């Protein structure tokens, strides 16, 4: 029953926003996301102690990997919905959005959260595919929320490219299903994760290779991996800041969760060699593209979007190593990246509302003029660049250690070279935005405490996880063994 409740909570929040159309209803939606996080933590503790939970007559299943992703979704959706209250209030007050569209925004955000939760709780690869497709449909409208020419172009580009990716993922899923049927699986259970992993040794290797390649290419589109990554900077730069936080902070990793699930099946059938080679190629290509594009970036929201491509490349490279240490580090990286990136996108929304531009050269002396926003933005970039004490520092070290253990040291060195280029590029952009002397009348009032508090809390959580990761160690260990038994 608890898994059904987790799915119902964001839908109840959306119903409250749709039915009441009141400011208080938006805070009720925030509360439902907080309850989702709390239930996710409870499920995680329960699963680590007693094993997987099932629900909805076997349609839903939560093992350690699913429970971890529910916690990530709950945390990021809580941050995004909290700041979303302010975002919509400012847009309505400024005449950029009607109350009706603000209501639609609130409903769509809650539907988006519900679809992501369904994706990670699905016991069936077909339900997973439907849920990921649902995230595409919902977020198309969220990307185009402002209805400007740029927003509409970005939403159409997102729809077309991600639809191609989802179609490829569908064909890959069908091939895996056909493999399971030919291996003697029952049609009713051939799509279940547990059945696929248990019967992996009997799957046709050649068909499975093609199926997994299509899955990586298809779901990799939603992850933002090369080659079908071009939708990501446009969508992230045009969407409202809370939507960008949800997309970059958690949607990308929900799609990567699907790749991890199929990787477990493929490795059980073929060994780790095939998936390792494929993921290394995709990862290093993504890192190279992110490094080259960040050097010439002029828009700080697009800068953050390209940084997402870098981090998804690092996650893919860590997953390529495939051993439990690597998968645990990947999951720690997913959580740290989600917290840091969501805080940065939410802060960028505040900066854009205050400065009236998203261009890097249009913002200066933030630390002096707007010390709260400048401090949060600068600290968030420190976290995102993988510097201590934040959790991304720990996860990147652990991934590199695992890569050297399995003979991928050369790939880790190549990734480090790309990261150095990215570090130099981002520091240069941040220097322009954060430093400088303000004019005599340019020191402005900080945002309200209720706006700054969740931003600071997200960064504090990212730092604490980097220093005190032991509360998560049992969950990370159990989740890693789901992918790499």
Annotated model-derived regions:
Residues 79-89, 114-126, 138-397, 401-432:
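Hydrophobic transmembrane alpha-helices and their helix-loop junctions in integral membrane proteins
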């Amino acid at each position: 029953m608890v898994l059904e409740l987790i799915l119902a909570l964001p839908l109840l929040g959306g119903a409250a926003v749709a039915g009441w159309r009141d400011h208080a209803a938006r805070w009720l939606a925030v509360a439902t996301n907080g309850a989702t996080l709390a239930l996710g933590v409870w499920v995680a503790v329960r699963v680590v102690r007693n094993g997987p939970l099932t629900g909805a007559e076997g349609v839903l299943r939560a093992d350690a990997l699913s429970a971890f992703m529910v916690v990530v979704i709950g945390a990021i959706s809580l941050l995004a919905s909290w700041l979303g209250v302010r975002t919509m209030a400012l847009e309505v007050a400024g005449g950029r959005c009607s109350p009706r569209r603000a209501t639609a925004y609130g409903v769509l955000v809650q539907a988006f959260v519900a679809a992501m939760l369904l994706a990670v709780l699905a016991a069936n690869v077909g339900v997973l595919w439907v849920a990921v497709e649902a995230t595409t449909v919902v977020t198309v409208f969220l990307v185009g929320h402002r209805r400007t020419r740029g927003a509409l172009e970005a939403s159409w580009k997102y729809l077309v490219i991600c639809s191609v990716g989802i179609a490829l993922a569908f064909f890959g899923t069908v091939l895996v299903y056909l493999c399971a049927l030919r291996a003697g699986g029952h049609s009713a259970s051939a799509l279940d994760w547990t059945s696929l992993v248990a019967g992996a040794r009997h799957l046709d290797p050649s068909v499975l290779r093609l199926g997994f390649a299509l899955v990586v290419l298809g779901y990799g589109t939603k992850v933002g991996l090369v080659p079908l990554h071009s939708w990501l900077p446009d969508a992230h730069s045009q969407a409202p800041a809370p939507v960008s936080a949800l997309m970059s902070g958690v949607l990308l990793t929900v799609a990567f969760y699907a790749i991890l699930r199929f990787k477990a099946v493929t490795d059980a059938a073929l060994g780790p060699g095939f998936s390792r080679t494929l993921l290394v190629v995709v990862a290093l290509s993504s890192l190279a593209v992110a490094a080259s594009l960040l050097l010439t970036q002029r828009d700080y929201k697009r800068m953050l979007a390209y940084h997402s491509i870098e981090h998804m490349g690092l996650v893919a490279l860590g997953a390529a190593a495939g051993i439990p240490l690597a998968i645990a580090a990947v999951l720690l990286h997913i959580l740290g990246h989600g917290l840091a990136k969501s805080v940065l996108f939410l802060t960028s929304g505040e900066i854009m509302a205050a400065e009236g531009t998203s261009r890097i050269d249009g913002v200066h002396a933030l630390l002096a003029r707007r010390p709260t926003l400048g401090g949060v933005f600068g600290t968030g970039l420190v976290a995102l660049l993988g510097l201590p004490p934040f959790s991304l520092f720990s996860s990147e070290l652990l991934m590199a250690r695992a890569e050297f253990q399995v003979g991928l040291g050369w790939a880790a060195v190549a990734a480090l070279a790309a990261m150095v280029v990215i570090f130099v590029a981002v520091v240069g952009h941040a220097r322009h935005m954060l430093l400088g002397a303000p004019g005599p009348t340019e020191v402005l009032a900080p945002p309200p405490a209720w706006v700054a508090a969740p931003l600071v809390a997200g960064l504090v959580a990212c730092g604490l996880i980097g220093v005190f990761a032991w509360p998560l160690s049992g969950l990370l260990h159990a989740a890693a063994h789901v992918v790499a038994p």
